[in-house]
From Swiss-Prot:
PROSITE patterns tied to this protein: TRANSKETOLASE_1 (PS00801), TRANSKETOLASE_2 (PS00802)
Gene3D superfamilies attached to this UniProt entry: 3.40.50.920, 3.40.50.970
Subunit comment: Homodimer.
Name of encoding gene: dxs1
Protein name: 1-deoxy-D-xylulose-5-phosphate synthase 1
Organism of derivation: Streptomyces avermitilis (strain ATCC 31267 / DSM 46492 / JCM 5070 / NBRC 14893 / NCIMB 12804 / NRRL 8165 / MA-4680)
Lineage of producing organism: Bacteria, Bacillati, Actinomycetota, Actinomycetes, Kitasatosporales
Amino acid sequence: MTMLENIRGPRDLKALSEAELGELAEEIREFLVHAVARTGGHLGPNLGVVELSVALHRAFESPVDRILWDTGHQSYVHKLLTGRQDFSKLRSKGGLSGYPSREESEHDVIENSHASTVLGWADGLAKARQVQGEKGHVVAVIGDGALTGGMAWEALNNIAAAKDRPLIIVVNDNERSYSPTIGGLANHLATLRTTDSYEKVLAWGKDVLLRTPVVGNTLYESLHGAKKGFKDAFAPQGMFEDLGLKYVGPIDGHDMKAMESAFRRAKRFHGPVLIHCLTEKGRGYEPALAHDEDRFHTVGVMDPLTCEPLAPSNGPSWTSVFGDEIVRIGEEREDVVAITAAMLHPVGLNKFAEKFPGRVWDVGIAEQHAAVSAAGLATGGLHPVVAVYATFLNRAFDQLLMDVALHRCGVTFVLDRAGVTGVDGASHNGMWDMSILQVVPGLRIAAPRDADQLRAQLREAVAVDDAPTLLRFPKESVGPAIPAVDHVGGMDVLHRFPESPQVLLVAVGVMAPVCLQAAELLEARGIGCTVVDPRWVKPVDPSLPGLAAEHRLVAVVEDNSRAAGVGAAVALALSDAEVDVPVRRFGIPEQFLAHAKRAEVLADIGLTPVEIAGRISAGLATKEELSKEKQE
């Protein structure tokens, strides 16, 4: 058996020698490269936290000590060390999640993979333990960009206010912009600054100086300033101590012995401690280290030797279509600028940034700031395009409502990964946007069905300068173009049964192919259908109620929550127009969806042509029976 195969839980790490730990780290990296290459996933971040994860589990007693991971995509090594080594179905249906999962293990605490939240969690858990007199440590691991999020600093401010509440923060600093201060001096200072004697000497010195008549206070302030200046010169993270946190580091994040020693000393300290570990994203895998873009942050199925993708390509992605079109628009209009929140490449703005470096801003993990800054840009005479993942726009709802919409700012939001994303699980599905945003006055929402519509609707959106607009599209490759056969108002008619159609299928965006297939199945049963793409789903097209009145049933199909979504808006529009036609809503139920392929998730929740056609057919049959009963 390999060294890794002998690790069934954290306790198995305790007896390993320094040489064996080094061997284990090499095995883990080799395992990760080959396992993640088979399934896809977050490779670079996990290659960077191998030694850090081992040191944590040697120094602490999980699950009694609670180890919390921010941006949980860096928890693969943690999974391996806590008895989860079957990565054969990582991020696949029935397999391990790509993030921590309480269902998988008692060692996992936070399932949410939205960044910058772990310090708030840690603050609450530490308070709960203090109030209830429970033993054990709370350890929060934050990094991979998560400290760019404002929530992290709000939490730090609160954590620092409790000088007597033990809490250990581990900063996994894998940013290449930091200058490493590694070696004997840093390790010596790390040892010194967490000892009780160091604290006692500081307290004694302060007391003596402040008691000295006339010059005592001035002398203390001068010496304190000198100490701070020296500290900041060698460790620029002195701002942490200015908050009131005990700062330790920087420490070599690949030196297990140094980290374990720092962790054990931190356990003895009686207040909040921040340990700064310098790690290398993609460590041990040359292709990742050579990849300047993001050090193989996320990879698809690939050959681990050549790094060539093995999954078949089904054509251009929605992201690439957007990325190319926004560049063309930027060439035509100098007032169009772009903003993203730590997602420049994933949302397709990298080409825009290369072409117009002075017209794009990556604000870090700060969606709220992105929205407000966009409002300022719009007020200043520009048209900002804010591109983020759909699930992350949830964070900026108040700013979109009160800063963008209230001020009627011409801002275009582009939501990538909208609807069911699949393998990344519950917190990455973009299934709430069309429900949450229904209440925003003046906002217009577009859901393009194909690449041609994405290009057209993006241009329509940036032409609006007195209200916010929004486009949404999924993660998958773009399918073939779906032509319109007719137009009603602003809607595209995709299919029309020639004689007295009974069912009006309202296809929201990428659900158009599903609706066309459902219509084909229904017509095989003698039920004629009309299929329309509303294009702009908010506000509801004023022509829709009149078209609905020509049918016996309206069915709205959307890859969004059924609660308060497009179907609910259509039902309200028909009610307001006094059109007495029932509306069936097909969408995502009110539940968090387990990770699986997008097609598997859609099948599980009934968003397939067969399921939709069957339920519509059954509903019409029931309606006919009820009508007959009334006549009798």
